[in-house]
UniProtKB/Swiss-Prot annotation:
Keywords: Ribonucleoprotein, Ribosomal protein. The gene is rpmD. Disulfide bonds: none annotated. It holds the Pfam family Ribosomal_L30. PROSITE patterns: RIBOSOMAL_L30. This is Large ribosomal subunit protein uL30. GO terms for cellular component: cytosolic large ribosomal subunit. Gene3D superfamilies: Ribosomal protein L30, ferredoxin-like fold domain. It comes from Geobacillus stearothermophilus (Bacillus stearothermophilus). The keyword S-adenosyl-L-methionine does not apply. Part of the 50S ribosomal subunit. Belongs to the universal ribosomal protein uL30 family.
């Protein structure tokens, strides 16, 4: 079973540094309260850690 992560943008990127805006965009998030699903891997975890104060993460077990 592969783990997946549901990532939701909970805070706005307005007024945030450019590198944080780019990271949020790279995760596939464009609008507030939008949720995307990604495979759990070190690259995605690193991006989440960089913008942890802007997103909410939920682990999903795939069957």
């Amino acid at each position: 079973m592969a783990k997946k992560l549901a990532i939701t943008l909970t805070r706005s990127v307005i007024g945030r540094p450019e590198d944080q805006r780019i990271t949020v965009r790279t995760l596939g998030l464009r609008k507030m309260h939008q949720t995307v699903v990604h495979n759990d891997n070190p690259a995605i975890r690193g991006m989440i850690n960089k913008v942890a104060h802007l997103v909410k993460v939920k682990e999903i077990e795939e069957e």
